[in-house]
């Protein structure tokens, strides 16, 4: 009976004309303990069509809906192009990590194509996918094609983040790639353990490098993004595995920077790292919802060799003989009927920078620390403002002062390079199909910690336009202006422009 009533309610939500029907239903289910705060927050941030999809997915994962019942809710017109909305722009660790940094990827797999005249259009039974241990499982992914044009040299041709020194590579370049595509497995809904609901995620992309062959550019290697398991009680959760960090959880919206978050090295600290995490959140019915997260992480400070290696060797962070620690406190309230979230997070790790001075091996202490403020303000259904501001030292793991976050023993940056910055993005939902984003990011490294030739400042201006043809097909265009300054080498400061066109197929 419970399953029937929820299915009937979802069908009503799909037919209702009011934009917040699914949101109201989600709040009722949260009050009854069927939905978690995380799931409710994700649904409330979505538009009408996407909210129904997220709600259906959550109920399917909990075993309340079967896939055949989901098909009855959606009907043959589930992906009708006239009823498409973008999910709001910036994902945080407050929502399931599989959705992080991808505001255009729905969380419900597409139903098989059906024609209106097909005799099975209303009665098709969809076989559920399960693991060997009988966990319900979803396969998801995004096949992403990018074409790009750069007016000058950069650190990464297809995902440029930093402009090369003036004169080092003055030639423009063009190319295409699919290596930002990603694929994953998500499981949730099996038997409870100690009263907790189990879930997990494994996600891969193709940014692990290119094959060492003359024609190996298109033979991209697999890279691990996510691999974690969770246990969720009513108000608390624990997680172990590789996931997005608690520190600095937001990312700008971009299909040009899908594998490496936009504004990386321009004010956006980010990383996915092995960790053990604890979370507590207040009840969804409270006017102001509170989320507290604490985590112990792998102590890496971002000094891993850039060449391919077969074994891990101790680095600066590992020599600190203990984990790094992080925490984040976030409060979510309302602006009218929409969520507004402000969070404050911190990171600390201890390490030893080992080097040779005058023929003697010495160690210099490195305190890797950071403080970050994040905000997501959904002012209206047409406009959302989001961003971050940070300050810290030795944050190379987060692509802050990347490649120069801790310099060699005997140099000014031997204890770690101090850096600060931030980014902001204005998201405009023009209608159900079109979305435009304007963003700016800045990272400034402390000059007294640097050596000549290091990057002193990096700025990025970005705008993109996205056309969501359907929930499973998006077309996007993006332009960026990169401005990179080099320490004590002003004549080598560089500016490049980059343009990108992307086509995303979501399944």
What kind of feature is each model-predicted range?
Residues 1-4:
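Positively charged n-region of N-terminal signal peptides that target proteins for export
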Residues 9-17:
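Hydrophobic h-region of N-terminal signal peptides that target proteins for export
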Residues 16-156:
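N-terminal periplasmic/intermembrane-space "pro-region" immediately following the signal or transit peptide
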Residues 124-302, 321-336, 376-380, 386-387, ...:
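Outer membrane beta-barrel
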Residues 152-158, 211-220, 250-257, 302-317, ...:
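Outer-membrane beta-barrel translocator domains and adjoining extracellular loop/strand segments
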Residues 199-208, 296-298, 344-350, 435-448, ...:
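Transmembrane beta-strand segments that form the barrel wall of outer-membrane beta-barrel proteins
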Residues 320-322, 327, 332-455, 459:
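Detector for outer-membrane/organellar transmembrane beta-barrel domains
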Residues 467, 493-507:
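Outer-membrane beta-barrel "beta-signal"
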């Amino acid at each position: 009976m419970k399953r029937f009533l929820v299915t009937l309610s979802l069908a009503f939500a799909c037919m209702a004309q009011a934009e917040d029907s699914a949101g109201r239903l989600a709040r009722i289910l949260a009050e009854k303990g069927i939905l978690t705060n995380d799931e409710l927050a994700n649904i409330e941030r979505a538009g009408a069509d996407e909210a129904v999809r997220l709600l259906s997915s959550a109920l399917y994962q909990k075993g309340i809906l079967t896939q055949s019942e989901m098909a009855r809710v959606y009907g043959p017109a589930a992906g009708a192009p006239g009823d498409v909305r973008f999910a709001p722009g910036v994902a945080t660790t407050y929502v399931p990590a599989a959705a992080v940094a991808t505001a255009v990827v729905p969380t419900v797999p597409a139903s098989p194509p059906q024609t209106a005249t097909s005799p099975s259009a209303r009665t098709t039974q969809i076989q559920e996918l399960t693991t060997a241990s009988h966990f319900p499982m979803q396969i998801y992914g995004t096949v992403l094609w990018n074409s790009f044009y750069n007016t000058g040299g950069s650190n990464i041709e297809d995902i440029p983040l930093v402009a090369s020194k003036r004169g080092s590579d003055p030639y423009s370049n063009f190319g295409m790639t699919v290596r930002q595509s990603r694929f994953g497995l998500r499981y949730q809904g099996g038997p409870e353990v100690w009263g907790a609901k189990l879930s997990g995620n494994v996600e891969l992309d193709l940014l692990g490098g290119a094959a060492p062959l003359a024609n190996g550019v298109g033979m991209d290697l697999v890279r691990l993004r996510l691999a974690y398991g969770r246990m969720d009680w009513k108000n608390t959760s624990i997680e172990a595995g590789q996931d997005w960090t608690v520190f600095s959880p937001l990312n700008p919206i971009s299909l040009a920077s899908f594998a490496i978050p936009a504004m990386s090295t321009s004010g956006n600290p980010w990383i996915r790292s092995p960790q053990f995490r604890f979370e507590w959140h207040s009840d969804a019915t409270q006017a102001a919802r509170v989320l507290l997260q604490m985590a112990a992480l792998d102590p890496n400070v971002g000094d891993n060799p850039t060449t391919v290696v077969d074994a891990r060797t101790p680095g600066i962070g590992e020599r600190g003989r203990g984990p790094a620690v992080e925490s984040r406190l976030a409060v979510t309230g309302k602006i009218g009927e929409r969520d507004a979230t402000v969070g404050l997070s911190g990171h600390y790790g201890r390490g030893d920078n080992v080097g040779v001075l005058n023929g003697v091996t010495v160690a210099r202490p490195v305190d890797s620390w950071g403080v970050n403020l994040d905000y997501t303000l959904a002012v209206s259904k047409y406009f959302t403002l989001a961003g971050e501001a940070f300050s810290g030292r030795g944050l190379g793991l987060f692509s802050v002062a990347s490649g120069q976050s801790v310099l060699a023993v005997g140099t000014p940056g031997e204890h770690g390079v101090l850096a600060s910055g931030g980014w902001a993005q204005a998201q405009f939902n023009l209608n159900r199909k079109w979305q435009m984003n304007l963003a700016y990011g800045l990272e400034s490294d402390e000059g007294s910690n640097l050596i000549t030739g290091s990057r002193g400042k990096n700025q990025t201006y970005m705008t993109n336009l996205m056309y969501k043809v359907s929930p499973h097909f998006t077309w996007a265009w993006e332009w960026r202006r990169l401005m990179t300054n080099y320490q004590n080498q002003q004549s080598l400061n560089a500016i490049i422009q980059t343009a990108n066109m992307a086509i995303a197929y979501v399944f």
